[in-house]
Amino acid sequence: MKITLALIAMSFSIPAVAQTSAASDPSDAVITIQPATDTSYTESFSSRRKAVAMRDDPKMSNLDKGRAAVVDFAQCLHDSDKGGARRVLMSGPGAPLKSAVVAFANGQCWLRGFISFRPSALQGGLFVVAYRNQFRSKSPGLLPEPIDYVKIAGTINEAQSGPYVALRRFGECVARSNLDVAHALAISDIASNAETRAFTDVSSALSVCVDVGRSVMLTKELVKYTLSEVLYRHATQLAASKGQK
């Protein structure tokens, strides 16, 4: 069995878990956002909401800059419209997610050039942001039972729901195999030393959750997005249940 963390910025193909790639799902087609054309409003918005651009860090690879851009953009959008962010976070795959993202993403959070992403990527970036914001200091843990991702997927066709559910069940397995490492990866900054260590540490947990004899290619963003989603859903449900007692 071989596990490879691929240095590919925006690829979402993992053969052993999800046979259907994002590229074959028309509802997850790439969206491109350009800066808002109203300069005065953009400047006002930028100072208030910290609109972002591609990071100009010579130490970061272009691939890492792309990963960081999605999370930075998601952070700005989350801060400016928490209600919209929650609608994206809670949307199931397919058309519901695309509609939520199209209504939510806007050029007021992007300063220069353009940013392109799939709806599933922006949702993943939002899960990173939301989990960090609420649970950076400590993971609340996991519910005794896995999340029902079939219910979240809803009534979309099997070609979409199968890969969606399989990937998140894979994430559940990784998180239960080593919660501390999953948490460390979810809260680490893009391309930081902490993230590099976390990716190294998480490899053994990934291996536990892949069938023997299979070779799997996992992108860094896919692992980070999936673990952040799994941890966030468990953490918020745990927090809600404790609040009701």
Predicted segments with their positions:
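Sec-dependent signal peptide recognition
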Residues: 1-7
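N-terminal signal peptide c-region/cleavage motif recognized by signal peptidases
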Residues: 13-15
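N-terminal Sec/ER secretory leader and immediately downstream segment
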Residues: 19-128
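Eukaryotic terminal intrinsically disordered regions
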Residues: 22-35, 39, 162-163, 167, ...
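Short, low-complexity cationic-aromatic patches
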Residues: 65-71, 78, 161-168, 175, ...
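Extended intrinsically disordered, low-complexity coil regions enriched in Ser, Thr, Gly, Ala
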Residues: 78-102, 177-214
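Extended amphipathic alpha-helical interaction segments
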Residues: 121-190
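A cross-kingdom marker for long, charged
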Residues: 196-245
